[in-house]
Amino acid sequence: MLRLDAELNKDTISKLKKPLGKLYPHFEDAIEEIKSSEFLISVGDATFNNLTKYELYPDIGIIDNLIQRKNHNHEVIKAENILKAKNPAGTITDDLWETIGQAMKLSGDGNCHVIEVDGEEDLAVLPCILMASDETTILYGQPNEGLVLLKVCDAKDYAQNLIDTFIKE
């Protein structure tokens, strides 16, 4: 599997500002589709909070304890395992890749596995797309716009193309 310490270039940043899947302005509008997901990954604290508010727990949740760069501590995390990864802003580190892989190996047991990122989790969507099965649904927040729901089968090629544009350290 592809592993790299990489950072964004300006062209990739502009591409990532567009939703990679279907944008729902209101979380509630996506609930039925979320419930029908075979395997669910959430990226971001607000997305994780919204899921747990409705007592929906992803197979894998990736958080950094920040919502729009403000500290946020989750009062209750119902998770079988809490894994840790270091990932500075604007990068995808080997540590993040490996921790996502570890969470995927642990998942599928009906429990929620959380990756707590020291740094920033935003770009974790890309390795999740590349490492997850085609049946996986990934949720993440699009700042000030809503929730993005993407089906991995529809995004693998695009995610690989984005990863290919990263600058290797």
Swiss-Prot record:
<keyword id="KW-0808">Transferase</keyword>
<comment type="similarity">
    <text>Belongs to the GTP-dependent DPCK family.</text>
</comment>
<dbReference type="GO" id="GO:0015937">
    <property type="term" value="P:coenzyme A biosynthetic process"/>
</dbReference>
<comment type="pathway">
    <text>Cofactor biosynthesis; coenzyme A biosynthesis.</text>
</comment>
<keyword id="KW-0342">GTP-binding</keyword>
<feature type="binding site">
    <location>
        <position position="45"/>
    </location>
    <ligand>
        <name>GTP</name>
    </ligand>
</feature>
<keyword id="KW-0547">Nucleotide-binding</keyword>
<keyword id="KW-0173">Coenzyme A biosynthesis</keyword>
<dbReference type="GO" id="GO:0016301">
    <property type="term" value="F:kinase activity"/>
</dbReference>
<keyword id="KW-0418">Kinase</keyword>
<dbReference type="Pfam" id="PF04019">
    <property type="entry name" value="DUF359"/>
</dbReference>
<feature type="binding site">
    <location>
        <position position="121"/>
    </location>
    <ligand>
        <name>GTP</name>
    </ligand>
</feature>
<comment type="function">
    <text>Catalyzes the GTP-dependent phosphorylation of the 3'-hydroxyl group of dephosphocoenzyme A to form coenzyme A (CoA).</text>
</comment>
<feature type="binding site">
    <location>
        <position position="64"/>
    </location>
    <ligand>
        <name>GTP</name>
    </ligand>
</feature>
<dbReference type="InterPro" id="IPR007164">
    <property type="entry name" value="GTP-dep_dephospho-CoA_kin"/>
</dbReference>
<protein>
    <recommendedName>
        <fullName>GTP-dependent dephospho-CoA kinase</fullName>
        <ecNumber>2.7.1.237</ecNumber>
    </recommendedName>
</protein>
<dbReference type="GO" id="GO:0005525">
    <property type="term" value="F:GTP binding"/>
</dbReference>
